């Protein structure tokens, strides 16, 4: 340093090695330090004409990139290499567009099996080509995503679950996935789904599924827990579908199985219900949100319409439709607003076991889980999400405060007011264990509660 002719000293004493979220402050400190040396640095400046001449000379020395005649892949097995080469076939014979190429590289890396992907120009037999450099993960596939879920929607009776999602890639062909979810604790279950495109480049896919699940099913009378059932479901089905880019998909299929509700803590006079279920379904999903846990921008839409030919307790078949819309509006870099809407109906038909449930921590949080079981409902949510702090990346993400107002109606429940509503305040944070939420809610008709939640289902 003592040999330098000019020293621009940036005061960094106020920063530590974990202040990743203060990058803008550090950059500003550097600019301010340079501005303090403006008088000395200006002596090294050149005029506009000289600078333009330098740019012209530099551009004249640049060579145009050769047009690739082939695509090659290294760093992975021959089968996967052939599929990547096929996916990149349109690059041959055209100039390489760096921006588009980077998007394609990011897409391939997002499939989950590569630790790193890059590209460079190469030459073979005197012909220019594009070389994809792949570095596969040593520990995957399969990809194992652990689950920790503590649900304190009734904080006096929290539930605890452990589990994992195990995903096998390229089973059968490139882009095929075999996804398996396992959960144990207050809930026991296993779900297996196989996603298989018609061919590696196709947007059309088939998806058979099988599942078995045993979980708590509490019943409330207003704020009072009156019974606790175990809900047991064993079933399966299959879909044919179409994906629209990376943000939307449409599915059509059929599900069939058996569902039963067995009393654990309940009056012996309360019924036990069981029977076959079967339904044809059409489902559309769109998701452009910037996060699947705490979203601050983007939108999501889920719509389904089903026809049940059988359902426990239902005297005959019935149609069902449900929609959920999530809309996030950034106000500044720390604050966003949102407006969500939900609705569902069986069009006046008796569905047996009511298919829609409000209450818990997500929809009408002042009510208990399954406090509002209904054949028809609507619900609106609006609120503000404010980031209070930023955790270091190795611990998680941002700490937010969520202020929410909810209003809706569950039809066909006699003791309820005309509409149900509440105000909710909760602290939310993304952590290495998943999202954590702690808050409280106050609603009409005397409903109020404290709640917490750690983690989320897959």
Predicted feature descriptions by range:
Residues 1, 390, 413, 422-427:
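Short glycine-rich, acidic/polar surface loops and turns
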Residues 12-15, 22, 441-447:
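A short, acidic, flexible beta-alpha connecting loop/helix-capping segment that sits on the rim
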Residues 24-151, 164-165, 181-198, 234, ...:
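Periplasmic polypeptide-binding modules associated with outer-membrane biogenesis and secretion
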Residues 1-15, 25-31:
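Conserved catalytic block of serine-dependent lipid acyl chemistry
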Residues 7-10, 400-404, 435-441:
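Conserved active-site loop/cleft motifs that coordinate metal ions or position small ligands
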Residues 110, 116-118, 129, 143-153, ...:
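C-terminal outer-membrane beta-barrel translocator/porin domains of Gram-negative envelope proteins
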């Amino acid at each position: 340093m003592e040999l330098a002719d000019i020293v621009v000293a940036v005061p960094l004493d106020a920063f530590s090695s974990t202040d990743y979220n203060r990058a803008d402050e550090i950059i500003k400190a550097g600019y301010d330090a340079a501005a303090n040396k403006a008088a000395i640095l200006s002596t090294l400046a050149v005029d506009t004409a000289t600078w333009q001449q330098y740019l012209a000379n530099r551009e004249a020395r640049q060579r145009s990139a050769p047009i690739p005649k082939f695509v090659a892949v290294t760093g992975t097995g021959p089968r996967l290499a052939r599929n990547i080469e096929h996916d990149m076939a349109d690059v041959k014979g055209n100039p390489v567009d760096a921006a588009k190429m980077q998007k394609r590289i990011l897409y391939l890396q997002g499939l989950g099996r590569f630790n790193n992907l890059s590209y460079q120009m190469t030459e073979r037999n005197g012909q220019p080509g594009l070389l994809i450099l792949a570095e596969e993960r040593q520990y995957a596939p399969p990809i194992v995503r652990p689950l920790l879920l503590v649900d304190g929607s009734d904080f006096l009776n929290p539930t605890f679950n452990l589990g994992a999602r195990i995903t096998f890639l390229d089973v059968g062909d490139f882009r095929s996935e075999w996804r398996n979810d396992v959960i144990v604790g207050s809930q026991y279950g296993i779900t297996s789904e196989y996603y298989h495109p018609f061919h590696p480049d196709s947007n059309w896919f088939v998806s058979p599924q099988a599942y078995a699940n045993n979980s708590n099913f509490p019943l409330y009378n207003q704020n009072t827990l009156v019974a606790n059932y175990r809900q047991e479901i064993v079933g399966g089905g299959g879909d044919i579908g179409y994906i629209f880019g990376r943000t939307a998909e449409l599915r059509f299929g059929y599900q069939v199985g058996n569902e039963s509700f067995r009393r654990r803590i309940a009056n012996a006079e309360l019924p036990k219900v069981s029977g076959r279920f079967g339904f044809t379904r059409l489902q559309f999903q769109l998701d452009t949100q910037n996060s699947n846990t705490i979203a601050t921008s983007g939108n999501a839409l889920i719509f389904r319409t089903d026809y049940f030919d059988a359902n426990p307790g239902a005297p005959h078949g019935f149609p069902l439709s449900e929609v959920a819309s999530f809309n996030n509006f950034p106000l500044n870099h720390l604050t966003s607003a949102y407006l969500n809407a939900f609705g569902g109906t069986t069009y006046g038909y008796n569905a047996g076991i009511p298919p829609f449930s409000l209450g818990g921590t997500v929809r009408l949080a002042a009510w208990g889980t399954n406090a509002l079981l209904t054949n028809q409902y609507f619900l609106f949510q609006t609120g503000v999400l404010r980031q209070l702090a930023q955790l270091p990346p190795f611990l998680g993400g941002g700490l937010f405060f969520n202020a929410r107002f909810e209003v809706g109606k569950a039809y066909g429940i006699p003791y309820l007011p005309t509409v149900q509503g509440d105000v909710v305040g909760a602290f939310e944070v993304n952590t290495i264990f998943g999202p954590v939420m702690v808050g409280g809610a106050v609603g009409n008709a005397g409903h109020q509660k404290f709640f917490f939640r750690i983690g989320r289902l897959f």
